[in-house]
Amino acid sequence: MLKLSFYRQKALEVLTPLYGEREAKSIRSLWFQERLGLSPVDCVLSENEYMGFDEFHNDLLALAKGKPIQLILGIAHFLGGNFFVDENTLVPRQETEELVLAILHKFKQKSLRVMDVGTGSG
């Protein structure tokens, strides 16, 4: 068991050079929320507590090799829903969610029909 502050700092040390600080913090937040059940506020309030984090080393190695956090966790969040993902599915991207929201906003007064073509697991 190590202090939560160790896990938080080590995650940023490894992820920041790969993703930049903002994205590294976002990945860490999602990772810790899913694996430890801790919100970002809980992480700050609990940083001096000792915690077991069995998956930490293997998760961090996979992240360092560029594996998306969603594939590591097996879940992706998209428009308020949680979706199972694995190596056979495409991970929904933040940009796609933003595009969908922009389209919904632009055409909010119209009834839309959408065709999903070539997205892999859709």
Language model features with spans:
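N-terminal auxiliary segments of SAM/dcSAM-dependent transferases
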Residues: 1-73
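SAM-dependent Rossmann-like transferase core, predominantly class I methyltransferases
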Residues: 58-122
